[in-house]
């Protein structure tokens, strides 16, 4: 792998660890389960006959019947001041799946409005571990960050070209040029500490705190 992965995904790991410490010391009750995963680039481990990364966890969740939790993939959250709620996954399955996904999606939008007023967007995100859960028929939402200028430019392109949404989700070659710079930095030597932004930490702290206080029942 090229680069140190400062944004993808060291920043989010650090943010979630700090959040876990707060959950443990400052809240009398919460219904949060935190799972860290790695090795998604490996894919299927043919020697041990199992999936790596989030796909392995998603397959276990499905086998155990854990399909009603609100699942979030916290991914690449160290650069930017705008919270991004991924719309990727909508209309990806049966009517039952779509209903559950839309309920989770709308609840996430409400959390974004409360925690990051006027500093959030919802757009298609062509990466993140929520895709593994969606592939297993389990609704999951990706949460990430972008600088305001990049988020605004990307949204304008989506508004100009209504086919672009599908191109992004399917990772079409035609969509690569319009993707935000932050995403283009992933897996390159530009994914470094120097390209992280200090304001990202407060944005994520606000969202994660709102998520902990939500206490929605699965």
Q: Which residue ranges define each predicted feature?
A:
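Glycine-rich beta-alpha junction loops
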Residues: 75-78, 146-150
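Structured lumen-facing ectodomains of secretory-pathway proteins
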Residues: 105-109, 197
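Hydrophobic residues within well-ordered alpha-helices
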Residues: 133-134
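Short hydrophobic alpha-helical runs that function as membrane-insertion/retention elements
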Residues: 141-144
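His/Asp/Glu-rich mid-to-C-terminal helical/loop segments that flank catalytic regions of hydrolases
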Residues: 150-218
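Acidic/histidine-rich catalytic neighborhood of metal-dependent amide-processing enzymes
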Residues: 1-100, 107, 122, 126, ...
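Short catalytic/ligand-gating loop segments at beta-alpha or beta-beta junctions
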Residues: 110-128, 147
């Amino acid at each position: 792998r090229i680069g140190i992965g400062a944004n993808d995904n060291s920043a989010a790991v650090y943010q979630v660890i700090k959040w876990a410490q707060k959950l443990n010391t400052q809240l009398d009750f919460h219904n949060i389960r935190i799972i860290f995963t790695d090795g998604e680039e490996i894919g299927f481990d043919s020697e041990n006959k199992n999936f790596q990364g989030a796909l392995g966890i998603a397959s276990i969740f499905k086998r155990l019947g854990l399909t009603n939790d609100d699942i979030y993939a916290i991914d690449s959250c160290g650069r930017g001041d705008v919270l991004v709620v991924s719309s990727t996954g909508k209309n990806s399955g049966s009517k039952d799946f779509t209903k559950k996904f839309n309920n989770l999606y709308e609840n996430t939008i409400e959390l974004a409005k409360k925690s990051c007023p006027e500093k959030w967007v919802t757009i298609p995100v062509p990466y993140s571990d929520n895709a593994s859960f969606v592939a297993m028929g389990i609704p999951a939402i990706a949460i990430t960050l972008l600088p305001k200028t990049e988020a605004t430019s990307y949204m304008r392109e989506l508004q100009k070209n209504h086919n672009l949404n599908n191109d992004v989700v399917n990772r079409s070659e035609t969509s690569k040029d319009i993707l935000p710079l932050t995403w283009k930095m992933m897996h390159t030597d530009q994914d470094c500490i120097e390209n992280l932004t200090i304001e990202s930490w407060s944005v994520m702290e606000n969202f994660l705190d709102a998520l902990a206080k939500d206490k929605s029942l699965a």
